[in-house]
């Protein structure tokens, strides 16, 4: 085993023992670092001390020429930077040779939104089954508030203020925000809460699976896709498409970009991390005036 391999093995043990990363994450790191080991060996390197920024750039170019996409290259360089940072912390390197090397930005492909008529058709589902009531409530909340999938499945009953028509969500970066959800969503949440105890009452989660546990993201994706087919929509229905539709419809109706951005938990629609700070009353007024389905009761 070369010094290149030895250092990587030490780093992976550190990630496993000290950082307690999951096996899947460890495997991803291992794959990315094996690629740089192979490239470094081909170029005659015996140790990481011989690696410089030129070699890292050449490695990035080679990876792209072999068909690695922009997102994949960004992941690979991120793993490499983290590894070299660790070597610096261990006094094995004086500086991180990958620090100034960045991957080209991956183009953003926003999903096609569902138009208002198709959204009405999607939401007009048969509610004879309690699980259908739950799904209708999830669809209404997802579209009514533009939630991320993780925010939807993470909702607890305590996060609701149905009298005010509001919900608290924990977004990316543990940023909490209060959102209006509209009277349609409130009505369907109340309908679901009347049936929820059929599946279990011990879990704090708002939305439960048929086994009485917090519903999983995969289950939500599956159910939404099934409803899209049942309701005759031409496009595949998935949670992010509802979030995108929320944003599109709100912007078309209001033109208030900053208000919609705040409702989404973004500084802008390209999901940059610069947050604006609008007061909640303004957000509520934007919502009340613009959303095509979920105008709140006063």
Swiss-Prot record:
Residues 2-88 form the Core-binding (CB) domain. One of its GO terms (molecular function) is DNA binding. GO terms for cellular component: cytoplasm. This is Tyrosine recombinase XerC. It is found in: Cytoplasm. It comes from the Bacteria. The keyword Magnesium does not apply. Site-specific tyrosine recombinase, which acts by catalyzing the cutting and rejoining of the recombining DNA molecules. Binds cooperatively to specific DNA consensus sequences that are separated from XerD binding sites by a short central region, forming the heterotetrameric XerC-XerD complex that recombines DNA substrates. The complex is essential to convert dimers of the bacterial chromosome into monomers to permit their segregation at cell division. It also contributes to the segregational stability of plasmids. In the complex XerC specifically exchanges the top DNA strands. FtsK may regulate the catalytic switch between XerC and XerD in the heterotetrameric complex during the two steps of the recombination process. InterPro entries: CB (IPR044068), DNA_brk_join_enz (IPR011010), Integrase-like_cat_sf (IPR013762), Integrase_catalytic (IPR002104), Integrase_recombinase_N (IPR010998), Integrase_SAM-like_N (IPR004107), Recomb_XerC (IPR011931), Tyrosine_recombinase_XerC/XerD (IPR023009). Keywords: Cell cycle, Cell division, Chromosome partition, Cytoplasm, DNA integration, DNA recombination, DNA-binding. PANTHER family: PHAGE INTEGRASE-RELATED, TYROSINE RECOMBINASE XERC. The active site is at 148, 172, 240, 243, 266, 275 (o-(3'-phospho-dna)-tyrosine intermediate). It comes from Escherichia coli O6:K15:H31 (strain 536 / UPEC). Disulfide bonds: none annotated. CDD domains: INT_XerDC_C. The keyword Transferase does not apply. The lineage of its organism: Bacteria, Pseudomonadati, Pseudomonadota, Gammaproteobacteria, Enterobacterales. Belongs to the 'phage' integrase family. XerC subfamily. Forms a cyclic heterotetrameric complex composed of two molecules of XerC and two molecules of XerD, in which XerC interacts with XerD via its C-terminal region, XerD interacts with XerC via its C-terminal region and so on. GO terms for biological process: cell division; chromosome segregation; DNA transposition. Residues 109-288 form the Tyr recombinase domain.
